[in-house]
């Protein structure tokens, strides 16, 4: 890096952005370290060799180092001021916006996408009208049922502001962070286009129409599954991609082939450039034609971050060819980072940006170093080293953003990548030919179909192998930083030293350290699942319990909230999944998690659970996925070292035909902590427990029936006198949970109250014998 000014400038810009965002001293220390490295490198290679007699030569020798140091400092300051300017610009209008506010927006239509039967319209160069104020703002997103407007036209739109929601549990999709990284701060609901004026962007609209037509050719000539994959792979059209197929590619570790990136640009762009050079076109003519085609292709595929990076690097390569200079990948990568981040500094927190740049760094910095050291004789060996380098560079980030890594991905890529060029070439050729002749296109798509069938077979085989996916949990960012610093030091040492075998073990140890993120000690997490229940308990002995898990107002709560939470925590399996009763708001997520083939050893019911349709469905799912069924009677206990989880209700004397009334009630207790889990019992069952002296004081109380006014009775709470009470309910739910009477009774008992709809996930840990509560949404 210290021999590449563009990389130094990019590093300065990145550190400046990070310093302004977090304002931490260690970021300034890293910048100072890089600056010292630049100065030391220049002193070692340039300045110390200056002649004392030749003053002119000395002056020239000092000018270049001064320029390099000045550039680094300038870009460091540019990063600080650029991010500060963007933040001030955003806050100027965001501070005035609220959910549900009626506003009018004027902006230029810059992009359109068809998704789920609706057209997503993206406006840039926007002006926002709030009352009497008109403020410039970032991009706006809204949806239309028909595609009546053209790219480039200016639209005046009225609608209701919907601000993006932050994730409310660990591991959940954070819409606010995702869209803010793309400079889209809110969307308009119930949007009405009031006026349209201005000329369309003829080229942009034609490119969009061409994309839609080629996608239509795929739909006409291929199966739905093949269409989804090929449209995503060649056009960036993700709306047709089947969710199951996408997940299969991710688990197999080949989802990168679905993103328009350097692989696509090299196949198409370099293929065309070499063809033009072969037919004796000049460097300039070949470069202009290839560059124009790749620029147009980038626009047609949606100009994602990885696409922009690949296109910019390709342009640098073409420019180098034209002026007769060798191409340096790291310098091109540094220039790409500068251009992208000067346009949008928030992309520094976008997974696609980080993974794209990490993959190229893996190839160039790690892969080329390994190749120089090992000097492989065969292309196979060289490809293996490059693939290993990419994995080494990207796996920590994969673990950070997705909480699991595909174990066999390096092996699978050996089968997938050699024929990807054929698939892309025939797929695009067939798409264009299909505009003229669907029959000829169908012939070209036959090999594409069989390649995709082969990919599917390979993916399914890899997923079926033992330990196909390793749930890593989300590593701390400090671990990631340490990993990359040590990786750089190891590569430097491998270049300088002859004995290198030990460094391989260091690299493997580092990777394992990053990927090992177990839950430690006692922890209780009350998840935000909307109107429902879901709690995770990790004991000191390492046993994993989960209580209920469902929702009536959050769609696919198991898929999008509960399972990502468990993976982010690094929980590889649940030992005992407790089901209080079989209402949908307690089991809908559990069913999804079983269907996702996540490992659950046991599902635990009350001995007196009602034998209804929901219960039978759960039994069938458990049998299908190899989960054992256990039933607890009053007095039964799970022992776990010094801890115990005891069933205190229902017993054989309590009769009812109501699911809620027969909820399984459990008391957990260890040396420091005690808690009671109540399901959806009502005040009648609570009174029964008090009268039969089955309850006593506890540290933690899960409010019965989501804080219902018909539960959480005064006598029951006085008997429990909990230190901490949590209420799991959805925002603006139709049941009025939590009830005012319940809240009054809880507070009267002396308990602190925490609601998931306000706090997000609520975590309880023990420190020095006292419970400590952490709220996920605190400070967000």
Question: What is the predicted role of each segment?
Answer:
Residues 4, 8, 20, 47, ...:
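Hydrophobic alpha-helical transmembrane segments in multi-pass membrane proteins
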Residues 1-10, 402, 416-421, 434:
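Membrane-anchoring/interfacial helices and their immediately flanking loops
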Residues 1-93, 309, 357, 480, ...:
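N-terminal leader/targeting segments
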Residues 56, 62, 72-256, 560-564, ...:
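Membrane-interface helix/helix-cap signal primarily in integral membrane proteins
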Residues 126-133, 143-160, 171, 178-179, ...:
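Non-globular, low-confidence helical/coil segments that flank catalytic cores
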């Amino acid at each position: 890096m210290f021999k590449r000014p563009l990389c130094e400038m990019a590093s300065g810009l990145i550190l400046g952005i990070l310093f302004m965002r977090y304002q931490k001293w260690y970021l300034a220390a890293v910048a100072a370290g890089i600056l010292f490295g630049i100065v030391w490198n220049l002193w070692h290679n340039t300045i110390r060799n200056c002649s004392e007699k030749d003053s002119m030569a000395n002056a020239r020798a000092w000018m270049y180092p001064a320029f390099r140091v000045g550039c680094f400092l300038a870009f460091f300051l540019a990063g600080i001021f650029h991010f500060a300017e963007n933040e001030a610009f955003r806050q100027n209008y965001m501070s005035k916006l609220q959910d549900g506010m009626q506003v009018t927006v004027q902006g230029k239509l810059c992009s359109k996408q068809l998704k789920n039967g609706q057209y997503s319209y993206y406006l840039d160069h926007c002006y926002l009208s709030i009352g009497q104020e008109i403020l410039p703002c970032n991009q706006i997103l809204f949806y239309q049922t028909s595609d009546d407007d053209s790219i480039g036209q200016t639209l005046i739109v009225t609608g209701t502001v919907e601000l993006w929601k932050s994730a409310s549990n660990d591991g959940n999709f954070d819409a606010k962070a995702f869209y803010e990284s793309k400079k889209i701060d809110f969307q308009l609901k119930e949007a009405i286009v009031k006026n349209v004026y201005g000329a369309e962007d003829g080229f942009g609209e034609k490119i969009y129409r061409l994309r839609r037509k080629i996608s239509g050719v795929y739909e006409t000539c291929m199966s739905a599954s093949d269409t989804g994959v090929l449209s995503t792979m060649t056009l960036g059209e993700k709306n047709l991609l089947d969710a199951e197929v996408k997940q299969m590619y991710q688990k197999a570790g080949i989802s990168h082939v679905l993103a328009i990136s350097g692989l696509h640009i090299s196949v198409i762009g370099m293929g065309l450039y070499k063809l033009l050079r072969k037919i004796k076109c000049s460097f300039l003519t070949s470069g202009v034609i290839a560059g124009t085609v790749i620029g147009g292709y980038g626009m047609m595929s949606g100009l994602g971050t990885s696409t922009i990076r690949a296109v910019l690097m390709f342009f640098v390569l073409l420019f180098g060819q034209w002026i007769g200079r060798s191409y340096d990948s790291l310098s091109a990568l540094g220039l790409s980072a500068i251009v992208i981040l000067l346009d949008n500094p928030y992309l520094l927190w976008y997974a696609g940006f980080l993974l794209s740049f990490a993959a190229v760094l893996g190839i160039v910095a790690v892969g080329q170093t390994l190749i120089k050291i090992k000097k492989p004789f065969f292309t196979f060996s060289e490809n293996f080293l490059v693939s290993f380098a990419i994995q080494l560079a990207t796996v920590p980030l994969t673990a950070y953003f997705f909480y699991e890594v595909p174990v066999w991905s390096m092996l699978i890529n050996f089968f997938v990548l050699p024929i990807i060029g054929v698939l892309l070439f025939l797929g695009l050729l067939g798409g264009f030919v299909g505009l003229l002749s669907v029959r000829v296109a169908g012939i070209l798509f036959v090999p594409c179909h069989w390649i995709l069938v082969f990919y599917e077979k390979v993916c399914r085989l890899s997923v079926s192998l033992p330990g196909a996916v390793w749930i890593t949990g989300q590593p701390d960012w400090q671990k990631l930083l340490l990993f990359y610093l040590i990786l750089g030091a190891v590569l430097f040492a491998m270049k300088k030293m002859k004995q290198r075998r030990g460094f391989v073990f260091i690299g493997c140890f580092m990777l394992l350290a990053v990927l090992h993120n177990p839950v430690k000690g006692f922890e209780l997490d009350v998840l935000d699942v909307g109107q429902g229940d879901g709690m995770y308990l990790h004991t000191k002995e390492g046993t994993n319990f989960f209580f209920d898990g469902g929702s009536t107002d959050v769609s696919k709560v198991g898929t999008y909230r509960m399972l990502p939470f468990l993976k982010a925590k690094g929980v590889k399996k649940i030992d005992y999944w407790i089901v209080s009763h079989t209402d949908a708001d307690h089991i809908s997520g559990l069913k999804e998690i079983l269907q996702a083939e996540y490992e659950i050893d046991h599902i635990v019911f009350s001995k007196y659970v009602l034998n209804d349709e929901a219960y039978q469905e759960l039994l069938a799912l458990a049998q299908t996925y190899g989960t054992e069924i256990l039933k607890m009677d009053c007095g039964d206990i799970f022992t776990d070292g010094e801890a115990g989880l005891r069933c205190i209700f229902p017993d054989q004397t309590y009769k009812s035909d109501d699911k809620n009334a027969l909820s399984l009630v459990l008391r957990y207790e260890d040396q420091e902590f005690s808690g009671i889990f109540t399901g959806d019992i009502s005040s009648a069952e609570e009174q029964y427990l008090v009268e039969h002296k089955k309850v006593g004081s506890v540290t933690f109380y899960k409010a019965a029936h989501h804080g219902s006014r018909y539960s959480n009775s005064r006598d029951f709470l006085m008997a429990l006198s909990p230190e901490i009470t949590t209420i799991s309910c959805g925002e603006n739910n139709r049941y009025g949970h939590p009830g005012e009477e319940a809240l009054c009774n809880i507070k009267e008992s002396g308990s602190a109250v925490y609601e998931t709809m306000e706090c997000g996930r609520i975590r309880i840990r023990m420190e020095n014998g006292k419970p400590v509560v952490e709220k996920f949404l605190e400070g967000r």
